[in-house]
Amino acid sequence: MSGEQQLDADLGSGVEVEEFSWEDYLEETGSTTVPYASFKHVDIRLQNGFAPGMKLEVALKNDPETYWVATIITACEQLLLLRYEGYGEDRKADFWCDIRKAGLYPIGWCQQNKKTLEAPEGIRDKVSDWNAFLQQTLIGACGPPVSLLEGLRNGRNPLDLIAPGSKLECQDFRDSLSTWLVTVVENIGGRLKLRYEGLESRDGFEHWLYYLDPFLHHIGWAAQQGCDLQPPLAIKHLKSEADWQEILAKVKEEEPLPSYLFKDKQVIGTHEFSINMKLEAVDPWSPFGISPATIAKVFDDKYFLVEMDDLRPEDHTRRSFVCHANSPGIFPVQWSLKNGLHINPPPGFRSQDFDWADYLKQCGAEAAPQKCFPQSISEHQFKENMKLEAVNPLFPEEVCIATVTAVRGSYLWLQLEGSKKPVPEFIVSAESMNIFPLGWCETNGHPLSTPRRARGHKLRKIAVVQPEKQILSSRTVHEGLKNQLNSTHSVMINGKYCCPKIYFNHRCFSGPYLNKGRIAELPQCVGPGNCVLVLREVLTLLINAAYKPSRVLRELQLDKDSVWHGCGEVLKAKYKGKSYRATVEIVRTADRVTEFCRQTCIKLECCPNLFGPRMVLDTCSENCSVLTKTKYTHYYGKKKNKRIGRPPGGHSNLSCALKKSSKRRKRRKNIFVHKKKRSSASVDNTPVGSPQGSGGEDEEDADDGDEDSLTEGSTSEQQEELQEESEVSEKKSSSSSPTQSETPTPLPPDTQTNKRDAQTSSVSDDENKPPSPKEIRIEVDERLHLDSNPLKWSVADVVRFIRSTDCAPLARIFLDQEIDGQALLLLTLPTVQECMDLKLGPAIKLCHHIERIKFAFYEQFAN
């Protein structure tokens, strides 16, 4: 596998996308949405066929077997406000009902089905003769269509009656205006996928229309208008005339959809256009600009054919479309100029600049007068930078997020975001039925194409490039990441609250609180997305990557002297079976993210570049590779305060008495020291313990246990060497370390005792008290003879030793956490369990080998 393929595999694995959230997206981009009321066609769909004043028979609430006549007061989507007849203007007994659940029946249903029709108890004594009252009340009354009520009782909304397989009539709006039958393939929220009757999907003549489109009608409309049903010219040649007539006869036998479903369609008025009039138009098949056009044909007083001008030879296909007086996308001459827009000259136009006066003279035509065009709608709520959902004009089956980039009168310029293929900015009318409000797709179960950045802003799982897989050169990795970022750059929108990608630079110094191995397992980056959401996720990951999550949470918790003025977020940490919570302040705006990340790193005493918007490849600008992570532990003994480690400038002295720690301990301070070259002189000059910065701040939190020091930063040569060795099976590793040899030479009994008393151990609480010398006994035949001082061992030396033991599978942990000889000698059972996440059994086995090294160290090199 090539480097690029490996990179793609690593970066592309494990990506899981959550649902798109409009609320989060609007906050991230700092934008607003078009008001719901701006989409009249959607609002009409929700009117459901019921209207105030309609009367029906409804079951009484306290007696479902008894019914009474009620009047619709208000209709709101699927809810009706009803009032029983007899209450007059009294509203106290008005009640709401769900049209899909309530028992609603047409007037006369009770009589036909022998059901009891009786007034409610509250008004029963108000009228002496209810039959006469009803006869008088129901004179001239109207009710909902019977088919509508029957559909509701079957659990269907009015619009659901237009089900797949339903038949409609559709006018051909491309060139001929011929009317033919279409079959509904899909109905998604009133948006219909249609196929010409008699054809199959493979024939490729499917198209999408909204059910209120003026060219779509119920069965029987053509006959009412005196038109013949004829297949469009584009498909007429596919079958014989006899076949078409046979198809027509079959459809006439089927029960048609109720015509009331289309009662809210736009009424087509008469026009005043004449043949050869010139105008400006938007080509509906390519709505990316405005061009000159001509009235090519007038069908009748309602419809006419507009043809886009084309000055090329006659063999070019002419693009045309049928219009009516209120059709969108047609404008009077000079409309573009008056609105500050560019008009695209017709194909074949030779001059550089297009001028309407010269063009009309050249064509010998006249401009269509202003009175022929509908009045522009000036009152609408569309504004620039607002968000909505819109149909892709090139791929009508796709609905995308769209941004209003410009508004001219009643026309909008939209830019799609997240479309499968790039689509230029296009023009639609503010009354277009191909645009929808926020959440329309989610409400109706229609797929919504969203920007790549938006799709990934809440990733549960992000591609992680593990350290052992980074065999590629840094240049290859960098180029791969650069290409990945560039691929999404075009669809990114920077907003005030949009946080950039936050990178975890695991090669940087991780400080005393964070586990370097766990940081290396974190995602390479989080985001982009909402600042609060991204930074909350980053801090949560860091807390979980700590030796003691509760301690890091305490370091991050909200400070009363904070200067960020952000928002407080409650974060959680779990440690030793206990849960901790604290309020942490997080910045809200993108301009403060970089400094927030830097200051948080400083607070955690790690490299300022450990995480942030900047990705560190090879060399950190802070030169953090020379820092080591060494801790100085102070605690209270029973008799006096003792210090662990060597005195300043003294010889190596790792001994401390194994005394029981008190419940109340001093807080340990951590300082950074520069890493010395590992020479014989460095042992004396680089103390394992130093009084510098050792603190006196008391601490009572039970979660602040002892953490052993892990030295940061092995050289790149060591890293490469160990990467190669890691491919070798642990089982085949040598039984002896290159730095050791077994020896049966016993120690004198008194020497043995003294050495055991001098073993190094971090003092922990009572539960995790390290094992006493009696618990870990070094047998005579297990003693080591070390060829070199373990205090000077590099990470590679430590890993080689571990691989030579029966704890070889744990060598990876030592490599990941870069534990060198100094750190190895400081390890104890509690810290091995806590810092390496080992269970008691493996931890004891590992500590057994560590104690052997310590014992050999005291015997051979301590003096």
UniProtKB/Swiss-Prot annotation:
Residues 680-691 have a biased composition (Polar residues). Residues 638-773 are annotated as: Disordered. Keywords: Chromatin regulator, Differentiation, Nucleus, Phosphoprotein, Repeat, Repressor, Spermatogenesis, Transcription, Transcription regulation. Gene3D superfamilies: 2.30.30.140, SLED domain, Transcription Factor, Ets-1. Its main location: nucleus. MBT repeats lie at residues 20-120, 128-232, 242-346, 354-451. It is found in: Nucleus. GO terms for molecular function: histone binding; transcription corepressor activity. Highly expressed in the testis, low expression is detected in brain, kidney, heart and lung. Highly expressed in germ cells, where it associates with the synaptic regions of meiotic chromosomes in pachytene stage spermatocytes. Residues 696-710, 718-727 have a biased composition (Acidic residues). PROSITE patterns: MBT. One of its GO terms (biological process) is spermatogenesis. GO terms for cellular component: nucleoplasm; nucleus. Residues 793-861 form the SAM domain. Residues 660-679 have a biased composition (Basic residues). PANTHER family: POLYCOMB GROUP PROTEIN, SCM-LIKE WITH FOUR MBT DOMAINS PROTEIN 1. The MBT repeats mediate binding to histones tails; however, in contrast to other MBT repeats, does not bind specific histone lysine modifications. The MBT repeats lack the conserved Asp and aromatic cage at conserved positions. Histone-binding protein, which is part of various corepressor complexes. Mediates the recruitment of corepressor complexes to target genes, followed by chromatin compaction and repression of transcription. Plays a role during myogenesis: required for the maintenance of undifferentiated states of myogenic progenitor cells via interaction with MYOD1. Interaction with MYOD1 leads to the recruitment of associated corepressors and silencing of MYOD1 target genes. Part of the SLC complex in germ cells, where it may play a role during spermatogenesis. This is Scm-like with four MBT domains protein 1. It comes from Mus musculus.
